[in-house]
């Protein structure tokens, strides 16, 4: 993929959510909540210079943030850095 975010933005791929409950009930796609965690796939030059994030970082983000995009058949989220709540190590 050759996508480069602009400004203070990052491209994030959401982490997959379980499709089954612990008791084995299958959850349909329309009943699942989208996960609020993901992996940074690309970041702007501005964000890279700050050194706080890098490609591969796992992040937590605000519920109603970002713009959904589809690139090369995969779904991603373009987020402003200010919408990121933290990283997972």
Curated annotation (Swiss-Prot):
GO MF term set: ATP binding; metal ion binding; protein folding chaperone; protein-folding chaperone binding; unfolded protein binding
GO cellular component: cytoplasm
UniProt keyword Mitochondrion present: no
InterPro entries tied to this protein: Chaperonin_GroES, Chaperonin_GroES_sf, GroES-like_sf
UniProt KW keywords: Chaperone, Cytoplasm
Cellular compartments annotated: Cytoplasm
GO biological process terms held by the UniProt record: chaperone cofactor-dependent protein refolding
Disulfide cross-links: none
Pfam families registered for this protein in UniProt: Cpn10 (PF00166)
Similarity annotation: Belongs to the GroES chaperonin family.
Function: Together with the chaperonin GroEL, plays an essential role in assisting protein folding. The GroEL-GroES system forms a nano-cage that allows encapsulation of the non-native substrate proteins and provides a physical environment optimized to promote and accelerate protein folding. GroES binds to the apical surface of the GroEL ring, thereby capping the opening of the GroEL channel.
Quaternary structure annotation from Swiss-Prot or TrEMBL: Heptamer of 7 subunits arranged in a ring. Interacts with the chaperonin GroEL.
Protein name from the UniProt record: Co-chaperonin GroES
Gene label: groES
């Amino acid at each position: 993929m050759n996508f480069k975010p602009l400004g203070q933005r990052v491209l994030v791929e959401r982490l997959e959510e379980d499709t089954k409950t612990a008791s084995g009930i299958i959850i349909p796609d329309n009943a699942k909540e989208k996960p609020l965690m993901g992996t940074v796939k690309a970041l702007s030059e501005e964000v890279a210079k700050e050194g706080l994030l890098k490609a591969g970082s796992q992040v937590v983000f605000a519920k109603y943030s970002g713009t959904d995009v589809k690139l090369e058949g995969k779904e991603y989220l373009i987020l402003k850095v200010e919408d990121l709540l933290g990283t997972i190590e």
